Curated annotation (Swiss-Prot):
GO terms for cellular component: nucleus; plant-type vacuole; plasma membrane. Coiled coil: none annotated. It comes from Arabidopsis thaliana (Mouse-ear cress). The gene is RABG3B. Keywords: Cell membrane, GTP-binding, Lipoprotein, Membrane, Methylation, Nucleotide-binding, Prenylation, Protein transport, Transport. The modification Cysteine methyl ester is found at residue 203. It is found in: Cell membrane. Interacts with VPS39. It is a lipid-anchor. PANTHER family: RAB FAMILY, RAS-RELATED PROTEIN RABG3B. A lipid is attached at residues 201, 203 (S-geranylgeranyl cysteine). This is Ras-related protein RABG3b. Plants silencing RABG3B display a significant decrease in the number of both protoxylem and metaxylem cells in the basal region of inflorescence stems. One of its GO terms (biological process) is programmed cell death involved in cell development.
Amino acid sequence: MSTRRRTLLKVIILGDSGVGKTSLMNQYVNNKFSQQYKATIGADFVTKELQIDDRLVTLQIWDTAGQERFQSLGVAFYRGADCCVLVYDVNHLKSFESLDNWHNEFLTRASPRDPMAFPFILLGNKVDIDGGNSRVVSEKKAREWCAEKGNIVYFETSAKEDYNVDDSFLCITKLALANERDQDIYFQPDTGSVPEQRGGCAC
């Protein structure tokens, strides 16, 4: 019986403090949500094992503190990432306006071989608050931002209600796997092919 290949994927989650990055991770990995807010200091990661088709995947999800003083965590933290997840709070305009900075921060620090093809995904979190009546960033506005950045995949989520959490992380895993395959192709000798630009997620 052949041994199935196990793949380690590194995913980095970026966004302002308080947008729910840690809550999304905990809901996905531990099926838990806490009402108490505790700021992440520096960086931390959790792992989750899953199977995609015939691949055994270990998803290593890195959570960063969103405070400005922790924004530059160092090149080593970003390098080797297979996917970058950007998170904002649909009820907090500043967290949406900060997305450009986080997007640029990642590209500058991680220096992906093909920035236009590198997989990003955007999560608009906390859609459950006040039944959606408190939101200040529309889905249309978020999707327009994604289109400007090369058709980034977008999900609206609620860590508290476990809304779209599993679906979004499954998509993240598939995007990361696709990026890993593109990197394998890139390093093959005598190839003139360029990794295809992302357009969506076959979730």
